Amino acid sequence: MLQIKQDLLDALGQALKTMAPDSGVAAVFESPKVAAHGDFASTAAMQLAKPLKLNPRQVAENLRGLLLQAPAFARWVDAIEIAGPGFLNIRLKPEAKQQVVREVLQGADQYGMQLADSPHRMVVEFVSANPTGPLHVGHGRQAALGDAICNLFDTQGWDVWREFYYNDAGVQIQTLATSTQARAKGLKPGDAGWPEPAYNGDYIADIANDFLAKKTVKSDDREFTASGDVEDIDAIRQFAVAYLRHEQDLDLRAFSVRFDNYYLESSLYSSGRVDSAVQKLKDAGKTYEQDGALWLKSTDYGDDKDRVMKKGDGSYTYFVPDVAYHLAKWERGFSKAINIQGMDHHGTIARVRAGLQAASAGIPQGYPDYVLHTMVRVVRHGEEVKISKRAGSYVTLRDLIEWTSADAVRFFLLSRKPDTEYVFDIDLALAKNNENPVYYVQYAHARICSILGTWAAQGGDASQLKSVDLSALDGPQAQALMLLLAKYPDMLSNAAAGLAPHDVAFYLRELAACYHSYYDAERILVDDEAIKLARLALVAATAQVLHNGLKVLGVSAPHKM
């Protein structure tokens, strides 16, 4: 059906050129807000009315006449109706919609994907938690968002690089070290001599005990053996960071999130990248000194005020390593960069982009892109859950996975726009009913697999479904299901362009609902062989698209439930 839609759009474009060669009106189809109005809709007639100085409905009549003469419309379109002030509502013939079943079954896991001969390179930075404690549910939302956005761009033919940026050079790391040292010396929160500020969770005691036991910890890219010397604060710091990096690796593994690279903030200093970035800005004439500090002329690039880069004591402000880091992204060949961060990072966007523009490195405006998300509240039995014994002051990602499942956490956290607050209801995530969105979608897939399994047990061969006669798929529920399957590729493309994985979750819920309606309307395993095979082909195609969409979200598509 993809080619059919393109042929119809080409015919519409040619008709628009015939009527108004210089109008600039694009050939675009929209989805009617009411399904009964048709399968595609066009507002082109209303857009042409002004340049043609004609009534929109008259333009629609003229445009309709041209379209009816086009071979593609004659072959695939059942009717073109004019509605309201000049809408063109297009109804497809059943055989046009039936084409999508073959496209899905032939494309299989590749259905909806765009292939590129020479894909552009992009980097998506997400999670990027300080190695100072277990990952909390906010990090979980970021992990789900980042991984799904990477998966979306994978489907669009991009060469996607997944990166975790470790903030291992800030004051929080020193707080981690002093907290661990205090635990190693036998102190507890509230004792005389307990440091302030400090991390108070039970995990600090675990780190201290392993440090005293001289254990070795290994994260994905390095390992460190404890010395056991409670006076060696640097050794304690290195061990604590390695320990928590390992713990975070375990959290992410439980969430099925992988990274291609772990980039250390400290490496920006040790490699000289921070000093180099500052020198670039100086050489470009985009800095000045005032009150003993070095300032960036960030107002030249849309920031609301100039920003201090280097304080009087010689230390850099926190956005300077961010500028250096993003210069490094560009220099590594990433033409597109996306950062998934909490809403509290909103204030850094303008100054980081200003620094990149001021560096005169050829970086386009708006680099990098940002997806900002709000935090997550967790409720159980109607009461908010705030405390985790392990973390001390927040619910961890691992808590949530253990209480529910990785699938539920993923789907739930992706089922709302990132900038809307989300309340994670543990009871709902555990429910086995239609109110639970992930259960509802997964059950649709499992239900189809059960039908196909029953047929296979009777001697059915799934490979023959790619070529069966589909003319029996002419009922309204079947037509609606096929039209929705046909929307999957455009939905994926639009979701990637809009950095909107929630659109995939919305689509899957709609597809599951459409399938359940079809299942209730028509028996699949009927006696008539031709009808049975056609219906089996349709439900097999539906299962394939459910599987593909769930894979984008990082959620499993079970065969049994």
UniProtKB/Swiss-Prot annotation:
Catalytic reaction annotation: tRNA(Arg) + L-arginine + ATP = L-arginyl-tRNA(Arg) + AMP + diphosphate
One GO molecular-function entry: arginine-tRNA ligase activity
UniProtKB keywords: Aminoacyl-tRNA synthetase, ATP-binding, Cytoplasm, Ligase, Nucleotide-binding, Protein biosynthesis
Subcellular location per the Swiss-Prot or TrEMBL entry: Cytoplasm
GO cellular component: cytoplasm
A Gene Ontology BP annotation from the UniProt entry: arginyl-tRNA aminoacylation
EC number, UniProt record: 6.1.1.19
Family matches, as SMART domains: Arg_tRNA_synt_N (SM01016), DALR_1 (SM00836)
Motif annotated as 'HIGH' region, chain positions: 129-139
A Pfam family matched in the record: Arg_tRNA_synt_N
SUPFAM superfamilies (alphabetical): Anticodon-binding domain of a subclass of class I aminoacyl-tRNA synthetases, Arginyl-tRNA synthetase (ArgRS), N-terminal 'additional' domain, Nucleotidylyl transferase
EC top class named in words: ligase
Subunit structure: Monomer.
Protein family: Belongs to the class-I aminoacyl-tRNA synthetase family.
Name used for this protein in its record: Arginine--tRNA ligase
Organism: Polaromonas sp. (strain JS666 / ATCC BAA-500)
